[in-house]
Amino acid sequence: ATTGCSCPQCIIFDPICASSYKNGRRGFSSGCHMRCYNRCHGTDYFQISKGSKCI
């Protein structure tokens, strides 16, 4: 867990069927998960993408 991360359970690292949030091979089941990842890792690299896709 990254120091300062307030939601360690929020991130999904395994491939999943993401409904709306995805980037490369990492998907998020919700916007919360995506925002938590971005905050914990100090990046805004992961953005919202349209459509559904298994990644």
Swiss-Prot record:
Where does the UniProt annotation locate this protein?
Secreted
GO aspect biological process, one term: defense response to bacterium
Is Secreted one of the keywords? Answer: yes
Q: What is its main location?
A: secreted
Q: Which domain of life is it from?
A: Eukaryota
Tissues expressed in:
Stored in hemocyte granules and secreted into the hemolymph.
Q: Which UniProt keywords apply?
A: Antibiotic, Antimicrobial, Disulfide bond, Immunity, Innate immunity, Secreted
**Disulfide bridge partners, by residue number:** C5-C40, C7-C36, C10-C32, C17-C54
Q: Which GO terms describe its cellular component?
A: extracellular region
Keyword hit for Secreted? yes
Q: Function, please?
A: Has antibacterial activity against Gram-positive bacterium M.luteus.
What is the annotated quaternary arrangement, including any partners?
Monomer.
Q: What is this protein called?
A: Locustin
> What species does this protein belong to?
Locusta migratoria
